[in-house]
Swiss-Prot record:
Protein name as catalogued: Alanine--tRNA ligase
SUPFAM superfamilies: Class II aaRS and biotin synthetases (SSF55681), Putative anticodon-binding domain of alanyl-tRNA synthetase (AlaRS) (SSF101353), ThrRS/AlaRS common domain (SSF55186), Translation proteins (SSF50447)
UniProt keyword terms in alphabetical order: Aminoacyl-tRNA synthetase, ATP-binding, Cytoplasm, Ligase, Metal-binding, Nucleotide-binding, Protein biosynthesis, RNA-binding, tRNA-binding, Zinc
One GO BP: alanyl-tRNA aminoacylation
Enzyme Commission number, as recorded: 6.1.1.7
Upper lineage: Bacteria, Pseudomonadati, Pseudomonadota, Gammaproteobacteria, Enterobacterales
GO cellular component terms given for this protein: cytosol
Length: 875
């Protein structure tokens, strides 16, 4: 009996654990501290800094089963998913790693033992082929002489990608840095499947499938291309779990393994599909994996970055569900079956199941409203298409109006043997981006160009004033030795109490005083390891190496400290009230208020907002001590400290605790005790994106000020309704009831007036070619009453053409009515359009009723006079 996918995953980890490897949990799909990566796409991502020598671990051998996503960016498999046997947006990468421990011999021996050992995968040795880099004689000899693979099944692969060391069998992290040859292991499915061995003209067939890649990092590539040997060579291997499962379960497609078979059955059940070979089932089964795990790891659908890739995948899945005939939202219903088939690998997903389901359902609901209209428009465009390529402008219009990602449009075209002009689409997208930039009002940001060598020591945790030395000056983004009165600049100090903006906390303001100069600091920013003070020299001159007295605005800093501490209390209170799925997604802390963005799938109820506010104020009244401790990052996480999503942390981190209520990593400035905050009040709760909510709040004096404002407002209202705080609600309700009664009475009077006006007007109708025509300008009649009057006149006249007009505030309001027996000859929309054009306006409507407006009141009499001749020409 073949192993299940879950058993294969566990066997891999158990094997390497028996060889002295530390089993390390999968890292998030959102790369930790690596802005160069859109998503985690390989097992080595979480060890990148270890391989670069920037980080050290307590172990020198590791093994993982890493969740990976390849969709968007350089590694983008999206368009092939569902149409090939092995492409996925989400997959698991099994890997073993050596950090300066073992090298080629042990790496190859371990791989062979696991693949062919009787107690492990027990693959037939004669089915395995290997490739090595062309000049890697060491690896070739290990395979041939020590492992016993015949030379005819060991293939040397050279530089087959158009440059030196540009090869399928030479791995490099970038243009410089760690790199080295690799050896790949292939499985031969047999001659009943088309394809040739690697390096042959038929290598793209499905007979020989790569199952494992062993990378040997043995060189450090220099900027001039020189390859220097690394002092401690390392090993990084990767084997796709789904691929090895297909081999061990004796199937030729990843979509036939047990995991996908169960998921595909679940997709068929929720969509009502009966043909289990339909490619759309594969697409959806793949996409629920990437989407569910991305949401679980903190990504939410949006129109940029990672969120946009997630949105594209969800919408592609929904469109394929639509093709299968799904009548209702279905995608979110696949989270539960996914958790079941993934087993222990889905523990975190299971904890966040309700949040993930809600985010997916909300996005599906949102897209379903426009999917049908967008597909109809696309069908019309393709029906009229000349040639085999849809133009980029149309693809962009589908994206801009209906939220159709271009790859979804390409998907539809592909099914019909057509293509999309993706270059034209990108041109239209870039034109939109350019318009957005031009309308944003932002010019060049010279500060963003500043590059500072060296570092500044931050002393602001303990000091509000500091004697410092100027180490650098920048004017218009360029380094200078001296600045003069009236000039704006950035001043860098060797040591400073000024906090540089980070972690949501704004930078400090204050003053730098020199012997004969004052520099007013309006903001403080970080430039690498340096802290830059932005501002203006009010008088004198300031030079590099001058001594200054750096003093922050302490009143402002104190308000910021209170607001920052309140965000920590708020975060903890939200998690207690709404659930553990709540995670910080962004914040702004200044001296006036705090803004806190967090993950949650629906608007908070008023009682939940009150509960959170009360909980924070309880902690303020407890006057908890606010304490900080510096420790190793892993120790801090072990202590339960929350590491914030997307935040970059050093090896040693600052852990901030507030009694027993909150523990977070934070480098900001804070109150000494929670009681210093005084009072906390929530001003608003709103949504910023799917699955993201925002709270704005105030503390201390700001919170007290809002109480005064609300009290003053209540007093004003009480005075207006002649009441007091005890009976204010009853008084306001009485005023509203009376207002509604008067409005109803007024409407009745207006209806009576309209009926009377209509009765008097009907006698003014004249015959034009045997048809009654009534044209009239009315005074002191509201525009919205014209429609009622036209309906009344139609009933009174039986068969007629009517045009009514009124004016107010230098604007013309027009309406035309045509009884249904005459609409084959006179259309109300055409009639009103002719009149509106003469008074500087436009309008339209149905053949029997149309409205319009205009701006030229003086032209109205002549325009109405022209109606009779126009109508006569139509009769």
């Amino acid at each position: 009996m073949s192993k299940s996918t879950a058993e294969i995953r566990q066997a891999f980890l158990d094997f390497f654990h028996s060889k002295g490897h530390q089993v390390v949990a999968s890292s998030s799909l959102v790369p930790d501290n690596d802005p160069t990566l859109l998503f985690t796409n390989a097992g080595m991502n979480q060890f990148k800094d270890v391989f670069l020598g920037l980080d050290k671990r307590a172990y020198s051998r590791a093994t993982t089963s890493q969740r990976c996503v390849r969709a968007g960016g350089k590694h983008n498999d999206l368009e092939n998913v569902g149409y090939t046997a092995r492409h996925h947006t989400f997959f698991e990468m099994l890997g073993n790693f050596s950090f300066g421990d073992y090298f080629k011999h042990d790496a190859i021996s371990y791989a062979w033992e696991l693949l062919t050992g009787e107690n492990w995968f027990n693959l037939p040795k004669e089915r395995l082929w290997v490739t090595v880099y062309e000049t890697d004689d060491e690896a070739f000899d290990i395979w041939q002489q020590q492992i016993g693979v015949p030379a005819e099944r060991i293939i040397r692969i050279g530089d087959n990608k158009g440059g030196a060391f540009a090869s399928d069998n030479f791995w490099q992290m970038g243009d410089t840095g760690p790199c080295g040859p690799c050896t790949e292991i292939f499985y031969d499915h047999g001659d009943h499947i088309w394809g040739g061995p690697p390096g042959s003209p038929e290598e793209d067939g499905d007979r020989y499938i790569e199952i494992w890649n062993l990378v040997f990092m043995q060189f450090n590539r220099q900027s001039d291309g020189t390859m220097l040997p690394l002092p401690k060579p390392s090993v990084d291997t990767g084997m796709g779990l789904e691929r090895i499962a297909a081999v061990l379960q004796h199937v030729n497609s990843n979509y036939e393994i047990d995991l996908f078979s169960k998921l595909i059955a679940a997709v068929a059940k929720v969509t009502g599909a009966t043909d289990l070979d339909n490619k759309s089932l594969r697409v959806i089964a793949d996409h629920i994996r990437s989407c569910a795990f991305l949401v679980s790891d903190g990504v939410t659908p949006s129109n940029e970055g990672r969120g946009y890739v997630l949105r594209r995948i969800i919408r592609r899945a929904v469109r394929h569900g639509n093709m299968l005939g799904a009548k209702d939202t279905f995608f979110y219903k696949l989270v539960a079956p996914l958790i079941e088939v993934m087993g222990p690998a889905a523990d975190e997903l299971k904890r966040q199941q309700s949040l993930v389901e809600q985010v997916l359902k909300t996005e599906e609901d949102q897209f379903a409203r426009t999917l049908e209209r967008g597909l109809t428009l696309l069908d019309e465009e393709l029906a009229n298409l000349q040639g085999d390529t849809l133009d980029g402008e149309t693809a962009f219009r589908l994206y801009d109006t209906y939220g159709f990602p271009v790859d979804l449009t390409a998907d539809v075209c592909r099914e019909r043997g057509l293509k999309v002009d993706e270059a034209g689409f990108e041109q239209a997208m870039e034109a939109q981006r350019r318009r957005a930039r031009e309308s944003s009002g932002f010019g060049a940001d010279y500060n963003s160009m500043i590059r500072v060598d060296g570092a500044s020591q931050f002393s602001g945790y303990d000091h509000e004033q500091q004697q410092s030395t100027v180490t650098a000056l920048f004017r218009d983004g360029q380094p200078v030795n001296e600045i003069h009165a009236g000039e704006e600049a950035v001043v860098v100090l060797d040591e400073t109490p000024f906090y540089g903006e980070s972690g949501g906390q704004v930078g400090d303001k204050g003053v730098l005083k020199a012997a004969n100069a004052d520099f007013e600091v309006s903001d403080t920013q970080k430039y690498g390891q340096a802290i830059g003070h932005q501002g203006k020299l009010s008088h004198g001159s300031l030079k590099v190496n001058d001594r200054v007295d750096a003093k922050i605005d302490t009143v402002r800093r104190n308000r910021i400290r209170l607001n920052h501490s309140a965000t920590h209390l708020l975060h903890a209170a939200l998690r207690q009230t709404l659930g553990e799925h709540v995670a910080q997604k962004g914040s702004l802390v200044n001296d006036k208020y705090l803004r806190f963005d967090f993950s949650h799938f629906e608007a908070m109820k008023p009682e939940q907002i009150r509960t959170v506010e009360d909980l924070v104020n309880q902690q303020i009244r407890r006057n908890l001590p606010v304490q900080t401790e510096v420790m190793a990052l892993d120790d801090a996480k072990g202590k339960g400290a929350m590491a914030l999503f997307g935040e970059k942390y050093d090896d040693n981190v600052r852990v901030l605790t507030m009694g027993d209520f909150s523990t977070e990593l934070c480098g900001g400035t804070h109150a000494s005790r929670t009681g210093d905050i005084g009072l906390f009040r929530i001003l608003s709760e709103s949504g910023t994106a799917a699955g993201i909510r925002r709270i704005e709040a105030v503390t201390g004096d700001g919170a007290i000020a809002t109480l005064h404002q609300q009290n003053d407002l209540l007093q004003d209202v009480a005075h207006l309704v002649k009441g007091d705080s005890n009976n204010l609600t009853d008084k306001v309700r009485a005023v509203l009831d009376r207002t509604r009664a008067l409005e109803k009475e007024l409407q009745q009077l207006k209806d009576q007036q309209a009926a009377q006006e209509s009765a008097s007007l009907s006698s003014k109708a004249k015959m034009v070619n045997g048809v009654q025509l009534l044209v009239s300008q009315l005074d002191n009649v509201e525009a919205k009453m014209l429609r009622t009057m036209v309906d009344d006149l139609k009933n009174q006249l039986g068969s007629a053409i009517i045009v009514l007009a009124t004016t107010a505030d230098d604007k013309v309001s027009l309406i035309a009515g045509v009884t249904k027996d005459l609409t084959d000859r006179v259309k109300a929309g055409e009639l009103i359009g002719n009149v509106a054009q003469q008074v500087g306006g436009k309008g339209g409507g149905r053949p029997d009723m149309a409205q319009a407006g205009g701006t030229d009141v003086s032209a109205l009499p002549a325009a109405l006079d022209s109606v009779e001749a126009w109508v006569a020409s139509k009769l």
